[in-house]
Amino acid sequence: MHVNNEIGSIQPIQEISKHLKTLKDKVYLHVDAVQSYAKINFRPSRYNIDFMSVSGHKVHGPKGIGFIYVKENNRIKPILTGGGQEIGIRSGTENTPGIYGLGEAIRIINEDLDGKIEKIKNLRDLLQKEIMENIEDIKINSPEDGVCHILNVTFYGIKGEVLLHYLEQKGVYVSTGSACSSKKKGSHVLNAIGLSPQEIEGAIRFSLSDLNTEEEIKEAVKIVKESVSDLRMIMRRR
């Protein structure tokens, strides 16, 4: 996993790749780039990546479609055989609208990609600054050198799940962790970085896009501040 989808930490793929080269046996490097593609500008060939997976919905493309990068001369044994579609890797009727939509989304997002990444980073910095200046008793869980679009924050004294639904009613959409493991108890990621059960319980994740604006960030923080204040007041009455 290139980028952790809960807190945004970036894994040292280049260093991992260099280490694999020193091993006696050939080890293939597959990178889950779902959270890093178009959020970090990199070329898989320069990182010596053998295989890389990307999901369309993370780049404003259709859901249910993605692509895999395969380094030249590498081979994948197909799971489905028969018709020979998708250059013999995955037989079956091709999702033509999804493929076209994904291709178009990738074309659009790669137009001035560096500019888009810089904009998202500035929005993330603004979000963090506004939260820290306007809301008391919080903890930033994302690393300073993390990916540009993820900010994980703990709000002490309330439950993240309750805050999530409270914000949802007001048009602000956040998450309490990975969509892949939202039904599990607690977050193993937040636990691994040393957060207490109470800090884990009060954590939510903000995810940003180049389509967001500074005005939206400031309005969202205003709503979060009001919501956190309301929920803390309710908790104190119990």
What is each PLM-predicted segment?
Residues 1-238:
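Pyridoxal 5′-phosphate
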